[in-house]
Amino acid sequence: MRRLFLLLLLLPVCAQAQDTSRVITQKGRAFRPGEVTISRGETLTFTNEDSFIHQIYVNGMFDSEEKGPGEVINESFPRTGTFQVRCHIHPTMRLIVHVK
């Protein structure tokens, strides 16, 4: 019984350790934060907190559909390097992603 109790206590910790997603907000025609460092294979969750549509792309890696206010886009980075995430709709929006 004691082992079962300890196992149940550890389950939430194990679940949290597997979460490899970070949240990037799109607000005020900007990505926030504007620069991140992540591990290869990690996922970034882009949340549109503006009142208009956004989109995200990295040349040669991904190009998303348009997303309205409150919508979310999840993208992973399978290669190491430094990448610039942009928005086709708002070309001044830039996020630098360093993938280790």
Which residue ranges define each predicted feature?
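Positively charged n-region of N-terminal signal peptides that target proteins for export
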Residues: 1-4
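Extracytoplasmic copper-binding redox domains, predominantly the cupredoxin/blue-copper superfamily
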Residues: 8, 15-100
